[in-house]
Amino acid sequence: EDGVFLEEGARATASILNTTTGPIYLAKDAEIMEGCIVRGGLALGEHSALKLGTKIYGATTLGPHCKVGGEVNNCVIIGYSNKGHDGFLGNSALGEWCNLGADTNNSNLKNNYDEVKAWSYVHKRFSKTGQQFCGLVMGDHSKSGINTMFNTGTVVGVSANVYGAGFPRNFIASFSWGGPQGTMEYKLDKALDTADRMMKRRGLEVDDVERGILQSVYEQTAEFRR
């Protein structure tokens, strides 16, 4: 009622839900924990959770099976990815099986308010996005360590592991390991082991299809890791 839609098993406890800017939808068994402040529109997927004190600005879509905390503005986080702790994420899109460490933050607006450029796989260079607000785009199975800072319009590929003090470069190639001090190749076998361990925590595993996709991405993106 009043723009809030709860599916079976969904619950919101001791939180502020404001639907004057858009509807709020909670899928089956989704949860909004105590102290959250949510401005619609929000779609919270099945078995997803907003952790204590989370602040959400629409338009945002999360899940299924995502845990989200901190401050989130105009983002899409696809299934089984987590941003479970404090930190800002704005105007961003995360693929499946990503994890942002505690206090990961991203910039979504340049200090000079200029149009954002971002890495284009089509042109193999940085290209204008036509956007003044543009945050982080992160591929499946990528991770950030605690206190990671992403600059405006950063593109992170598939199965990358980003960590370290300072701002990493605005384009992190798939299957890279490192941060501001430089990156090295994240070997395919190790990346697959990490993916399998993460998926098994959710009762899943890297099957032949997933393995084939990741191997194909690994081979196709080799030129960007040189």
Would you name each region that the model predicts?
Residues 2-3, 21-22, 39, 46-48, ...:
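N-terminal start-of-chain detector that recognizes signal peptides
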Residues 4-6, 26, 44, 94, ...:
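Hydrophobic beta-strand core residues of beta-sandwich domains
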Residues 1-40:
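Extended, small-residue-rich solenoid/repeat segments and analogous flexible loops
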Residues 10, 30, 48, 75, ...:
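Conserved hydrophobic/aromatic pocket- or pore-lining residues that grip, position, or stack substrates
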Residues 52-53, 59, 64-225:
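Glycine-rich hexapeptide-repeat left-handed beta-helix
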